[in-house]
Amino acid sequence: MNHTSQAFITAASGGQPPNYERIKEEYEVAEMGAPHGSASVRTTVINMPREVSVPDHVVWSLFNTLFMNFCCLGFIAYAYSVKSRDRKMVGDVTGAQAYASTAKCLNISTLVLSILMVVITIVSVIIIVLNAQNLHT
Protein backbone atom coordinates (compact mmCIF):
# COMPACT_ATOMS: atom_id res chain seq x y z
CA MET A 1 0.00 0.00 0.00
CA ASN A 2 1.59 3.27 -1.05
CA HIS A 3 1.27 6.66 0.63
CA THR A 4 -1.35 8.02 -1.80
CA SER A 5 -3.77 5.15 -1.18
CA GLN A 6 -3.29 5.49 2.60
CA ALA A 7 -4.04 9.19 2.40
CA PHE A 8 -7.12 8.48 0.25
CA ILE A 9 -8.47 5.88 2.70
CA THR A 10 -8.00 8.09 5.78
CA ALA A 11 -9.46 11.11 3.97
CA ALA A 12 -12.51 9.14 2.80
CA SER A 13 -13.32 7.89 6.30
CA GLY A 14 -12.74 11.30 7.83
CA GLY A 15 -10.20 9.89 10.26
CA GLN A 16 -12.95 8.23 12.34
CA PRO A 17 -13.37 4.49 12.88
CA PRO A 18 -16.14 2.74 10.93
CA ASN A 19 -19.53 2.30 12.59
CA TYR A 20 -20.22 -1.38 13.29
CA GLU A 21 -23.61 -2.95 14.03
CA ARG A 22 -24.32 -6.16 15.90
CA ILE A 23 -26.48 -8.57 13.94
CA LYS A 24 -28.12 -11.42 15.81
CA GLU A 25 -29.07 -14.41 13.70
CA GLU A 26 -30.71 -17.64 14.77
CA TYR A 27 -30.71 -20.87 12.83
CA GLU A 28 -32.54 -24.13 13.39
CA VAL A 29 -30.62 -27.27 12.71
CA ALA A 30 -32.43 -30.60 12.47
CA GLU A 31 -30.66 -33.75 13.57
CA MET A 32 -30.06 -36.35 10.93
CA GLY A 33 -32.01 -39.55 11.39
CA ALA A 34 -34.34 -38.26 14.09
CA PRO A 35 -37.99 -37.64 13.30
CA HIS A 36 -38.96 -33.97 13.19
CA GLY A 37 -41.79 -34.31 15.71
CA SER A 38 -39.81 -35.98 18.50
CA ALA A 39 -36.64 -33.95 18.70
CA SER A 40 -34.62 -34.82 21.79
CA VAL A 41 -33.20 -32.06 23.91
CA ARG A 42 -29.54 -32.34 24.70
CA THR A 43 -27.72 -30.28 27.26
CA THR A 44 -24.04 -29.52 27.12
CA VAL A 45 -22.29 -28.32 30.25
CA ILE A 46 -18.99 -26.55 29.84
CA ASN A 47 -16.94 -26.11 32.98
CA MET A 48 -14.98 -22.90 32.65
CA PRO A 49 -12.36 -22.41 35.34
CA ARG A 50 -12.85 -19.00 36.86
CA GLU A 51 -9.88 -16.75 36.73
CA VAL A 52 -8.32 -16.58 40.17
CA SER A 53 -7.00 -13.19 41.09
CA VAL A 54 -3.71 -13.57 42.91
CA PRO A 55 -2.45 -10.30 44.38
CA ASP A 56 1.28 -10.05 43.77
CA HIS A 57 1.95 -7.01 46.05
CA VAL A 58 4.44 -5.46 43.60
CA VAL A 59 3.45 -1.86 44.38
CA TRP A 60 3.67 -2.41 48.14
CA SER A 61 7.04 -4.15 47.74
CA LEU A 62 8.35 -1.34 45.55
CA PHE A 63 7.23 1.23 48.14
CA ASN A 64 8.96 -0.72 50.92
CA THR A 65 12.08 -1.08 48.78
CA LEU A 66 12.31 2.64 48.08
CA PHE A 67 11.21 4.11 51.41
CA MET A 68 11.31 1.48 54.18
CA ASN A 69 14.05 -0.94 53.24
CA PHE A 70 14.80 -2.33 56.70
CA CYS A 71 17.68 -4.84 56.37
CA CYS A 72 16.88 -5.22 52.64
CA LEU A 73 13.59 -6.96 53.45
CA GLY A 74 11.78 -4.62 51.06
CA PHE A 75 14.04 -5.64 48.20
CA ILE A 76 13.58 -9.33 48.98
CA ALA A 77 9.80 -8.80 49.09
CA TYR A 78 10.02 -7.08 45.71
CA ALA A 79 11.89 -10.08 44.27
CA TYR A 80 9.20 -12.46 45.55
CA SER A 81 6.49 -10.18 44.16
CA VAL A 82 8.07 -10.28 40.72
CA LYS A 83 8.35 -14.07 40.96
CA SER A 84 4.67 -14.20 41.90
CA ARG A 85 3.73 -12.09 38.89
CA ASP A 86 5.83 -14.32 36.61
CA ARG A 87 4.13 -17.46 37.96
CA LYS A 88 0.74 -15.84 37.44
CA MET A 89 1.57 -15.00 33.81
CA VAL A 90 2.64 -18.59 33.16
CA GLY A 91 -0.61 -19.89 34.68
CA ASP A 92 0.85 -21.49 37.82
CA VAL A 93 -1.71 -20.21 40.34
CA THR A 94 -0.38 -22.31 43.23
CA GLY A 95 3.19 -21.09 42.76
CA ALA A 96 1.97 -17.51 42.38
CA GLN A 97 0.01 -17.76 45.63
CA ALA A 98 3.05 -19.17 47.46
CA TYR A 99 5.35 -16.38 46.26
CA ALA A 100 2.66 -13.75 46.94
CA SER A 101 2.19 -15.05 50.48
CA THR A 102 5.93 -14.82 51.14
CA ALA A 103 6.04 -11.32 49.66
CA LYS A 104 3.11 -10.26 51.85
CA CYS A 105 4.79 -11.58 55.02
CA LEU A 106 8.04 -9.83 54.12
CA ASN A 107 6.18 -6.58 53.39
CA ILE A 108 4.35 -6.71 56.72
CA SER A 109 7.57 -7.40 58.64
CA THR A 110 9.38 -4.63 56.74
CA LEU A 111 6.61 -2.16 57.49
CA VAL A 112 6.41 -3.06 61.19
CA LEU A 113 10.17 -3.04 61.72
CA SER A 114 10.64 0.22 59.82
CA ILE A 115 7.88 1.98 61.76
CA LEU A 116 9.34 0.59 64.99
CA MET A 117 12.79 1.94 64.05
CA VAL A 118 11.33 5.38 63.25
CA VAL A 119 9.53 5.47 66.61
CA ILE A 120 12.67 4.33 68.47
CA THR A 121 14.73 6.99 66.67
CA ILE A 122 12.25 9.76 67.51
CA VAL A 123 12.04 8.69 71.17
CA SER A 124 15.85 8.45 71.38
CA VAL A 125 16.29 11.95 69.94
CA ILE A 126 13.73 13.37 72.38
CA ILE A 127 15.45 11.68 75.33
CA ILE A 128 18.89 12.92 74.22
CA VAL A 129 17.60 16.49 73.77
CA LEU A 130 15.91 16.47 77.18
CA ASN A 131 19.04 15.09 78.86
CA ALA A 132 21.19 17.71 77.13
CA GLN A 133 18.88 20.48 78.36
CA ASN A 134 19.03 19.12 81.92
CA LEU A 135 22.84 19.08 81.84
CA HIS A 136 23.04 22.74 80.76
CA THR A 137 20.67 24.00 83.44
Swiss-Prot record:
Any single Gene Ontology cellular-component annotation: late endosome membrane
UniProt-annotated location(s): Cell membrane; Late endosome membrane; Early endosome membrane; Lysosome membrane
Pfam families, sorted: CD225 (PF04505)
Annotated membrane topology: Single-pass type II membrane protein
Transmembrane segments annotated in the record for this chain: 110-130
Interaction with SPP1, as annotated region: 60-93
Region (Interaction with VAPA): 108-133
Induction (UniProt): By alpha interferon. Induced in pancreas during caerulein-induced pancreatitis. Induced in pancreas under systemic-lipopolysaccharide treatment and in intestine under Salmonella infection.
Post-translational modification remark: Polyubiquitinated with both 'Lys-48' and 'Lys-63' linkages. Ubiquitination negatively regulates antiviral activity. Lys-24 is the most prevalent ubiquitination site. Phosphorylation at Tyr-20 is required for endosomal and lysosomal location.
Residues recorded with modification Phosphotyrosine: Y20, Y27
Keyword Phosphoprotein included in the entry's annotation: yes
Residues bearing a lipid moiety (S-palmitoyl cysteine): C71, C72, C105
Gene Ontology biological process terms, A to Z: defense response to virus; host-mediated suppression of symbiont invasion; negative regulation of cell population proliferation; receptor-mediated endocytosis; response to virus; type I interferon-mediated signaling pathway
Tissue: Expressed in acinar cell. Predominantly expressed in nascent primordial germ cells, as well as in gonadal germ cells.
Cross-link Glycyl lysine isopeptide (Lys-Gly) (interchain with G-Cter in ubiquitin) per UniProt, renumbered positions: K24, K83, K88, K104
UniProt keyword terms in alphabetical order: Antiviral defense, Cell membrane, Cytoplasm, Endosome, Immunity, Innate immunity, Isopeptide bond, Lipoprotein, Lysosome, Membrane, Palmitate, Phosphoprotein, Signal-anchor, Transmembrane, Transmembrane helix, Ubl conjugation
Topological domains annotated Cytoplasmic: 1-57, 79-109
Side Extracellular, residues: 131-137
Intramembrane spans: 58-78
PANTHER family named among the record's database cross-references: INTERFERON INDUCIBLE TRANSMEMBRANE PROTEIN, INTERFERON-INDUCED TRANSMEMBRANE PROTEIN 3
Subunit structure: Interacts with ATP6V0B. Interacts with CD81. Interacts with SPP1; the interaction reduces OPN expression. Interacts with BRI3.
Similarity comment: Belongs to the CD225/Dispanin family.
Function, in words: IFN-induced antiviral protein which disrupts intracellular cholesterol homeostasis. Inhibits the entry of viruses to the host cell cytoplasm by preventing viral fusion with cholesterol depleted endosomes. May inactivate new enveloped viruses which buds out of the infected cell, by letting them go out with a cholesterol depleted membrane.
Name this polypeptide is given: Interferon-induced transmembrane protein 3
Organism: Mus musculus
Lineage: Eukaryota, Metazoa, Chordata, Craniata, Vertebrata
Gene: Ifitm3
